[in-house]
Amino acid sequence: MPELPEVETSRRGIEPHLVGNVIQYAVVRNGRLRWPVAEEIMKLSDQLVLSIQRRAKYLLIELANGWIIVHLGMSGSLRILPEERPAEKHDHVDLVMADGKVLRYTDPRRFGAWLWSDDLERCSVLAHLGPEPLSDDFNGFYLYTRSSNKKTLIKPWLMDNKLVVGVGNIYANEALFTAHIQPDRPAQTLTEREAHLLAETIKKVLQRSIERGGTTLRDFLQSDGKPGYFAQELFVYGRAGEPCRICGEQIESIKLGQRSTFFCRHCQY
């Protein structure tokens, strides 16, 4: 599933091609995504793109009369292509631009979404979200304060979008390893020092992944069609049974909150 770094990589990749350009019209080949493609999108005509923003794992395309909200779901990706490039089986939505390019949305599993909002402040999918992990609002003091009396296990707790957005399964695993914190401890056991280290580590892991173009494990591609390269730097995620890159002990895997969790029992405590 594309997580925050992959969505931010997509945003940065499409921004130079869309901002200041005009969407002539949209082509919707299959509108049966997680939610039906918004009617406002299907009726787009000659709309100037003002900005491309991101909130959590949602891409926000600002137009004069509203916002296109895109979620990549489990297997979605966005590419900038020539208009004449034929669509393939899983290419469901195109935004046809005035300069002859298209923004093409590909989603084999169709769990993504193309929504519309006239007012982001009243948009239900963006309500009740926690702070952005790369913002100043997310820090060790915030994390330590929120962990007080929390019996939830640390890893599922980190993945709660009401606590902080965008720390998905890959990056929760990697951040906890780098911070030397066992993923199945109750959140309330975090010390103040650990909370500060964990907040700092989450920022560094996410930023490094963004710099490397995200993590491609299966379907994700950058806007130019290239994979993300952070997968080559993973310490624990997807490495059950392999030796730890730090100590050589075997990486273990358990289920927490119905999600696969990877850790090194020697390096994390």
From Swiss-Prot:
CDD domains: EcFpg-like_N. One of its GO terms (biological process) is base-excision repair. The keyword rRNA-binding does not apply. Its EC number is 3.2.2.23, 4.2.99.18. HAMAP family: Fapy_DNA_glycosyl. Binds 1 zinc ion per subunit. Its cofactor is Zn(2+). The keyword Nucleotide-binding does not apply. NCBIfam families: fpg, PRK01103.1. One of its GO terms (molecular function) is class I DNA-(apurinic or apyrimidinic site) endonuclease activity. Belongs to the FPG family. It catalyses: Hydrolysis of DNA containing ring-opened 7-methylguanine residues, releasing 2,6-diamino-4-hydroxy-5-(N-methyl)formamidopyrimidine; 2'-deoxyribonucleotide-(2'-deoxyribose 5'-phosphate)-2'-deoxyribonucleotide-DNA = a 3'-end 2'-deoxyribonucleotide-(2,3-dehydro-2,3-deoxyribose 5'-phosphate)-DNA + a 5'-end 5'-phospho-2'-deoxyribonucleoside-DNA + H(+). Involved in base excision repair of DNA damaged by oxidation or by mutagenic agents. Acts as a DNA glycosylase that recognizes and removes damaged bases. Has a preference for oxidized purines, such as 7,8-dihydro-8-oxoguanine (8-oxoG). Has AP (apurinic/apyrimidinic) lyase activity and introduces nicks in the DNA strand. Cleaves the DNA backbone by beta-delta elimination to generate a single-strand break at the site of the removed base with both 3'- and 5'-phosphates. This is Formamidopyrimidine-DNA glycosylase. A zinc finger (FPG-type) spans 235-269. Monomer. Keywords: DNA damage, DNA repair, DNA-binding, Glycosidase, Hydrolase, Lyase, Metal-binding, Multifunctional enzyme, Zinc, Zinc-finger. InterPro entries: DNA_glyclase/AP_lyase_DNA-bd, DNA_glyclase_Znf_dom_DNA_BS, Formamido-pyr_DNA_Glyclase, FPG_cat, MutM-like_N-ter, Ribosomal_uS13-like_H2TH, Znf_DNA_glyclase/AP_lyase, Znf_FPG/IleRS. DNA binds at residues 90, 109, 150. The active site is at 2 (schiff-base intermediate with dna), 3 (proton donor), 57 (proton donor), 259 (proton donor). PANTHER family: FORMAMIDOPYRIMIDINE-DNA GLYCOSYLASE (PTHR22993:SF9).
